[in-house]
């Protein structure tokens, strides 16, 4: 019996061994297959890159013309000067393509679909995917051809014609033509599309028509930013977005979308349709990119990290490559050798960095708020100790703001004196407006006995915002004003803005060397979805803005902007808080990071060829 058991046991073991050998052979075969697939994919990728390089050579006119000397290759044609800086970087001895560039956003991005997104974060992503007709040199600020190879402007300034380059394609391989440029304007201007902000911005354009390779923008009247508006308009592929204009239903499908993003830029979405809020934002190199220089990084990634401390931890752990520090952090981090040995610090005023403000909503749910009274708004500015905010919270890495215009440029009125913290002056203004402490409880009330009490809404997760608002709460109570901090997530905040459902809100506007305040201060922009979300209306201001916008002569335009600044200074629809320095750390493996006149050389708000790269020996995410 024991012998029979041993025989059965031997048969069983033999059978099991045969199965194990079969499994091992299958795994070996599968591994060989995967290895073969990986090799095949590498060859396909290599061929795709070679084809893209060949396409670029054809575009340059360098193919079949014999070898190109090093001296000749370093001189780009005039219409390719937008790529000169990236081309120079690509000639560095240690230049290499590859690696990933990973950044973070302090809020969750609600949508990446063009024209639906009104925030800086989505725009930051879109500019790597969607091209524009022109771009700007970050050092000289000169406008340069990008998708357009040239342009002409009529003598009266009302007509601008761009000539689109030949042979350009979108990331899906379909051709980019002047018709796509014209379509992009018609698409956003269609009332079925939920793009009131962009329609406002492009409202001066009366028509955009294509003719062969030419596309002509016609303006209703002279406008000082006409060239910039036309040249920086996002170019969308008609074959991809056109179907959303077919009916109200398809337009609503577009309006509800969050990830419809396809363009001709140096990067593309992994899928141009599937991204959803909360997903990792991941772009991959567009191997069909038409530019003189291809994108250096294989992937461009943004993580949503909504808590400041968590962002810092992620940066220290190497999870993100570029980190914008808070002032207190920056002061400590630049003295930490463990940080500076692996990351390079940059400290600068970005002219496009804009300003932080508190906006006072003047009409809520159809009723006037206390902030409809100019004296109340001015009192709140006197109660806002902005210099203390700069000194104690921002550690001196900021300037107190007294208006929307860049104090380092010509647009700001140099004769306006910034209001200082003054509780007595604030109390006097509140009393003039009818707010006094009627029952001696330390809180001022209106004539109807209603306390002056409100909430300031601001983005949650930001320690700086939190510290500022908590400081203001303590300062306001000195004059008997009650304020409750109201931190909310970014999507909730955007909804509150669109519905004008807040008392006061603290946010920031991006800036430039010269800006147009029509979008957020003109009475016409109080419409639903418009950026005058505080319902501020002033016919005098409207007229000044309109006159400044149509004045093409800079010497005559600046005095008009000074009048706009003076009126805003008097009216205080916003309490302008401060303009921060950009305090940035960049991983030291990333080369050619520079501070230029326009800020860090990443392109900012413009589509611009990437100049950064990582030498092959230092690449972290190579395949």
Please name every model-derived segment.
Residues 124, 131-142, 234-294, 299, ...:
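Gly/Pro-rich hinge or "lid" segments in bacterial periplasmic/extracellular proteins
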Residues 188, 207, 270-282, 303-367, ...:
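Extracellular/periplasmic solute-recognition and catalytic clefts
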Residues 107-123, 147, 174, 226-236, ...:
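A structural "hinge/loop" feature
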Residues 255-256, 287-334, 474, 482-484, ...:
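Ligand-site clamp/hinge motif
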Residues 85-87, 99-155, 186, 262-266:
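N-terminal lobe/hinge region of extracytoplasmic solute-binding protein
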Residues 43-50, 149-194, 213-218, 311-314, ...:
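Aromatic- and charge-enriched surface segment that lines or borders ligand/interaction sites
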Residues 94, 163, 198-247:
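Surface-exposed binding/hinge segments that line
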Residues 15-24, 60-72, 77, 81-85, ...:
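Detector for C-terminal structural segments
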């Amino acid at each position: 019996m024991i012998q029979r058991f041993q025989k059965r046991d031997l048969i069983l073991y033999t059978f099991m061994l045969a199965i194990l050998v079969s499994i091992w052979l299958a795994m070996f075969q599968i591994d060989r297959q995967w290895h073969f697939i990986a090799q095949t994919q590498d060859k396909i990728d290599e061929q795709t890159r070679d084809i893209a390089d060949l396409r670029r050579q054809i575009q340059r006119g360098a193919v079949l013309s014999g070898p190109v000397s090093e001296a000749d290759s370093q001189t780009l044609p005039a219409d390719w000067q937008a790529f000169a800086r990236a081309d120079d970087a690509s000639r560095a001895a240690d230049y290499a393509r590859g690696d990933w560039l990973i950044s973070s956003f302090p809020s969750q991005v609600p949508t990446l679909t063009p024209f639906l997104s009104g925030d800086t974060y989505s725009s930051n992503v879109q500019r790597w995917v969607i091209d524009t007709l022109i771009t700007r040199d970050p050092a000289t600020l000169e406008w340069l051809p990008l998708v357009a190879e040239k342009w002409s402007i009529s003598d009266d300034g009302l007509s601008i014609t761009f000539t689109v380059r030949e042979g350009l394609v979108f990331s899906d391989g379909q051709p980019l033509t002047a018709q796509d440029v014209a379509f992009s304007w018609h698409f956003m201007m269609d009332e079925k599309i939920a793009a009131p902000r962009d329609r406002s911005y492009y409202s001066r354009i009366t028509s955009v028509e294509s003719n062969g390779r030419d596309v002509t923008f016609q303006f209703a009247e002279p406008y000082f930013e006409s060239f910039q508006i036309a040249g920086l308009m996002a170019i969308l592929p008609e074959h991809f977005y056109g179907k959303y204009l077919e009916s109200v239903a398809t337009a609503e499908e577009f309006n509800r979308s969050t990830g419809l993003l396809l363009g001709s830029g140096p990067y593309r979405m992994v899928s141009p349709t599937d991204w959803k809020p909360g997903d990792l934002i991941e772009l991959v190199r567009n191997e069909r990119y038409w530019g003189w220089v291809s994108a250096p990084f294989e992937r461009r990634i943004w993580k949503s990290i909504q808590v400041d401390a968590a962002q810092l931890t992620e940066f220290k752990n190497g999870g993100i490559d570029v980190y914008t520090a808070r002032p207190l952090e920056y002061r400590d981090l630049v003295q930490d050798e463990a940080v500076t040995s692996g990351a390079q610090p940059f400290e600068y005023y970005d002219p496009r960095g804009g300003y932080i403000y508190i906006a006072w909503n003047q009409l809520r749910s159809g009723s006037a708020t206390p902030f409809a009274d100019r004296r109340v708004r001015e009192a709140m500015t006197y109660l806002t100790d902005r210099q203390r905010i700069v000194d104690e919270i921002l550690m001196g890495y900021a300037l107190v703001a007294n208006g929307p215009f860049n104090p380092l440029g010509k647009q700001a009125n140099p004769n306006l004196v910034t209001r200082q913290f003054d509780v007595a002056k604030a109390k006097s203004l509140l009393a003039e407006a009818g707010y006094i402490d009627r029952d001696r409880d330390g809180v001022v009330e209106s004539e109807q006995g209603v306390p002056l009490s409100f909430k300031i809404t601001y983005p949650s997760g930001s320690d700086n915002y939190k510290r500022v608002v908590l400081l203001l709460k303590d300062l306001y109570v000195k004059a008997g004003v009650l304020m409750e901090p109201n931190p909310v997530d970014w999507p909730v905040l955007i909804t509150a803005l669109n519905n004008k459902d807040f008392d006061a809100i603290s946010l920031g506007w991006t800036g430039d060397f010269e800006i147009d305040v029509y979008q957020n201060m003109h009475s016409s922009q109080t419409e639903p979805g418009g950026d005058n979300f505080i319902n501020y209306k002033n016919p005098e201001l409207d007229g000044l803005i309109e006159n400044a916008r149509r004045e093409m002569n800079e010497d005559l335009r600046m005095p008009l902007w000074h009048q706009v600044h003076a009126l805003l200074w008097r009216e205080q629809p916003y309490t302008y808080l401060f303009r921060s320095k950009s305090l940035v750390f960049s991983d030291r493996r990333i080369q050619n990071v520079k501070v230029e006149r326009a800020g860090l050389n990443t392109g900012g708000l413009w589509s611009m060829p990437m100049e950064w790269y990582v030498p092959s020996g230092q690449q972290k995410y190579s395949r």
